[in-house]
């Protein structure tokens, strides 16, 4: 909003029932994660559970309800992007010291993500078990979110794309991207409803959207273009109405029918891919 409209006043006021501005509320939101969800104080917060992560039944990587155990590489990347957004807001609002603090915090977090979550042998970003300090060796699409965050060294990006993302035996299903690698023992397609919606192999459009932009940022335009094409074909051509998520092998739409949430991102992916709009 600030970037496109220049409306600084909106960030400096808040709802009538709040005593703090929207800008201050956004700062508190980020601080919440570090204050209440980083139990070992290493700068990397944990998900409450797979439900909390939004990937409902990825229990093998994010835990069961109220475990508060697994440091999510995706969560850390989301917070990194929020810190960079706060840096931009602070600059627009003339808060130079705030902007500097957000920039420093973002840089420190990016370093932690690349130090703690990256596995050199496998060439992949894994979550971390805060209790044991060990990586959670589950290949989830969450491991590609660092590409979207823009914090992956080029050589690592190449490994992510060539060894994992575009491998048809892992994530590049008939209608990519699978949210779990095919090599995972609990990989499954279809609307199984064992715990919320199925995120253990199916295709979810917001994941594709973020990965596409990560591919563009790292110079993999051909792969990004192919992903955009396959995604819009899946949503628009293979199904009569937009659905909540999709079977990555058959292309069948799953979940809510006539879903007007994140799945509509598919319709703008080809445009954004060709124009670079983000």
List PLM regions with ranges:
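Aromatic-rich carbohydrate-recognition surfaces in CAZymes
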Residues: 1-50, 73-76, 80, 136, ...
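Short amphipathic alpha-helical "recognition" segments used for binding
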Residues: 7-8, 78, 86, 188, ...
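Long, repeat-rich segments with strong aromatic
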Residues: 77, 81-93, 105, 109-112, ...
